[in-house]
Structure formats: C-alpha cells, structure tokens
C-alpha cells in the first residue's frame, strides 16, 4: 500500500471502521481499489484494502504506528482466507492463556523488554511469499507478530520490480486484544469480495494457461481435525500445475505440511482406508485374545457357581 494508494490512508470520508469503495482509473498495473476498512487498536491504526489488477484480487494490510511509521503486507484472497482461519486458532489459544506471572515479566525486563519466545507459531506458504505468525509477549502485553517475506524473482500481485531471487520482508504487530475485531473485519471483506477471486484458480502468478488455471472456479472448502495436542488442516488449492490438497500438521510450536496432487487422492484415500480396516481387525483380534485369557482363568469358577444355583 504505497502512500496515497489507499482511500482510507488519504483520510477519505468513511470514518473508523467504515467501508469505502473506491476506484483508480490508471496507475501501475491499473490497480483498482474495491474497499477499505480502518481499525483503531490501542495506539495503532490498521487499514485493510481490497484491490484488484490484471492478476486478480488481493488484500493489502497496513499498520500505522503512533509516530506515523507504516508497515504493509500483501495477501492474495486465497491466502487471506487461510490467514483468517489461522487467526481463529490464535484467538482460541490466546483465550486459554492465563495472565503472565511477575517472574515472566521480570525475565522479559532483564532481556531488555524484547519479546520472549513465541507462545504459539504458525506459517503460511504460497508461491513466492511466506507468512510467519507468532504470538509473543513483552512488558507492554501480548501481540501477534506477522512477518511476510517475498522472493522478488517470483512476481505476484503486489510485487514491485526487483532483482530475481532477492528477498524482502515486512512485519506488523497486532495487539492481542484486537485479534477478534481484526479477524471479523477480515472475514467481512473476504465474504464480500473473495467470491469471484480468479487467483483461487490460477495462483499469484497464474492465469488461464496452466492445467488448472481458470477451470476450477469452485473448490472444496478446507477443514481440520484435532487429535490430542495436534491439529490437522486439509486445504484444497489450485495453481498452474493443477489441483492439490495441502495437509498441515500443527502443534503449539511446530508446523509441517505435505502437498498431494489431485491425481493421487484416490490412492491416498485407498491406502488410508486399507490401513484403517487392517488396524480395526488387529484391534479386534487383540481384544478377543484378551477376553479369552481372562475367561480361561475364571471360567471354571463361573461354571461351578452355575451348578450350585441349579441344585438350589
């Protein structure tokens, strides 16, 4: 979001938390601004701007500090949806945290007041961009630090010119008390402007030329399951190589993911079903053996009791 790009940053009339449809006739890449929303959280202002250019719709998030300093992130609408879901996980985790102990705050002060280790971390990867989300804490409180790194060699929605392979990064810090308000504002923009997202079918640099580009305007919704302390996310995406399923394994301090192409889903599903059936049979056999062992030790006693009852 360059200076002057956003209608809300220019001080346009919608006021705090107001949607502000706007458009731009010319400019670089003929970018059109579709909506803008402003949030005031503690002493910071956050702007969420939905924009569109020839490559599709995308979201720009800007943080404006008390001194006027700005940090900006750029997300495709598909990544924005993943980001919204991740915010839900952080909100849930934050709600379960108790207050910081005096010892923890004192330790933070001894370290110069800087953030302690992350209370929860996740990351998102899409094409040439990576997003790192860390819930941290310092003497001023808890906050979600969001860092974006961009490989300039990959192009994309908001990428400007730069030497191939060169990485740049931007970071914003969202006070934890504003997580729900921020998530709800983001969800509203996605609901209103994410339905016709061409990028969902083509990827940040994609078009209609790839194997899946432009052919899959609708994909299955993502889902997740929780097992003990782990959570597994299933997200369907599409890029120039076709449709894929990303399976992410998430623990409080760890995240790993695999990507399964659409043509292998049937084989993966068959393998899972086969192993589930085999394990069910193994468990049943073990249970039967356990019952037999228990019955063998007490069977005689049960029979004698039955005979005594008959004699009575």
Swiss-Prot record:
The modification Phosphoserine is found at residues 6, 8, 101, 298, 304. Coiled coil: none annotated. This is Transcriptional regulator protein Pur-beta. Residues 28-254 are annotated as: DNA-binding. Homodimer, heterodimer with PURA and heterotrimer with PURA and YBX1/Y-box protein 1. Interacts with MYOCD and SRF. The modification N-acetylalanine is found at residue 2. The gene is PURB. It comes from Homo sapiens. The modification Omega-N-methylarginine is found at residues 24, 152, 294. Residues 1-32, 284-312 are annotated as: Disordered. GO terms for biological process: negative regulation of transcription by RNA polymerase II; positive regulation of transcription by RNA polymerase II; regulation of myeloid cell differentiation; regulation of transcription by RNA polymerase II. The lineage of its organism: Eukaryota, Metazoa, Chordata, Craniata, Vertebrata.
